[in-house]
Amino acid sequence: MPFEASSGDWFWNGGWYAGGESLWMDRSRNNRRTIAEQPFLDIRTGGLRFAKFTTTAQPFNVAPGARVTIGRSLGRDYLDRDRAFEFIYYGGMTYEDVDGWNAPFGGDNVIVPIAPFAPGFAGATQYATWFNSDFNSWEWDYKLRRRLGRDQLVMSPGGNWSRHAERGWLPALIIGPRLANVNEDFRLRTSQAGVSPATFSGTYTVNAANWLLGLNLGGELISQNEFFYWGLRGRAAPALSFVSTHQTAVGVSSVTTPPGIPSGTTNFTADATRTAPGFIGDLTLMAGWNITPNFALQVGYDFLWVAGIATATRQFNLDQRDVRPLDAGGQTFYNGLSFGFNGSW
């Protein structure tokens, strides 16, 4: 670490700068929907209870992602503030969930709320689900940041004078377009124990694609010291959400037991599109250490919120109640750790 650390030589050195961060983010749980349930008598209370299989039966694990920043310094403006243009990629998180359920008390009284009369689904005793969700974001921002004040002149014990950066708060303004993509897929497979799939089975698939285009409005507040910094950065982007969904269902039932199970086939496809209001917002709490004039290590904690999207488990239409099923009122929330570096040249 050099003895002399002036603001002119130590910070924002060079015309280009870049950053790379590894993200480890958790995702909010699915919209809760009951897929199947079976009533039973509680011998302790004498009351009726339900064994249920829902879309939130299993939690999500933390998924890795990345944030990459590439920026170009545009020099100072007439008020001596630093100007820059930067591109940021934020995303790469992919979440998967696999779950299953067997009716614990046989198949005589299993209720399927999402498809009470659909052949191949109603009356099933075995259920398997698969879920996938991902997130990616691209943004192009103009950044205007305050510079540190005048350097301090410090005399060493040997009588030599040296320049040192004066610590201070560095607010910044961030504005620019942002594009984000959220894709979700859900698949349900049903069967009966000991029965051939050709006699009884069902497969239901939901695909949801969301593209959000908005304008970033945000800022940054950094407490800059000679060799370390800490602060926060936040951005909010009101957006247009371009949503599309695709659903398919195929089922067959030719069993005669238990009585009352619908017989026949299920076979339908449904597509829908919509443009709706959306929102993208993120907040980062960060701290970093300047190792050299051109390189710093950084750690942080991140929050990310995406709203106005079609999440897969909000689109269930297996009973075909809606002609063009599409619910764009979904949202997802992410939070987790980040660590990486910043450098300039």
Put a short name on every predicted segment.
Residues 330-345:
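Outer-membrane beta-barrel "beta-signal"
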Residues 78, 150, 227-230, 294-297:
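Repeated loop/turn-to-beta-strand initiation elements of outer-membrane beta-barrel proteins
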Residues 24-28, 89-95, 146, 177-183, ...:
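Transmembrane beta-strands of outer-membrane beta-barrel pores
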Residues 1-77, 81, 86-88:
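Short glycine/proline- and aromatic-enriched beta-strand/turn motifs that initiate or cap beta-hairpins
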Residues 16-20, 81-87, 155, 169-177, ...:
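Transmembrane beta-strands of outer-membrane beta-barrel proteins
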Residues 20, 68-72, 140-144, 175, ...:
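Residues on the lipid-exposed face of transmembrane beta-strands in outer-membrane beta-barrel proteins
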Residues 1-17, 146-168:
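Outer-membrane beta-barrel biogenesis signature
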Residues 31-39, 46-61, 94-135, 182-211, ...:
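Extracellular/periplasm-exposed beta-strand and loop segments of Gram-negative cell-envelope proteins
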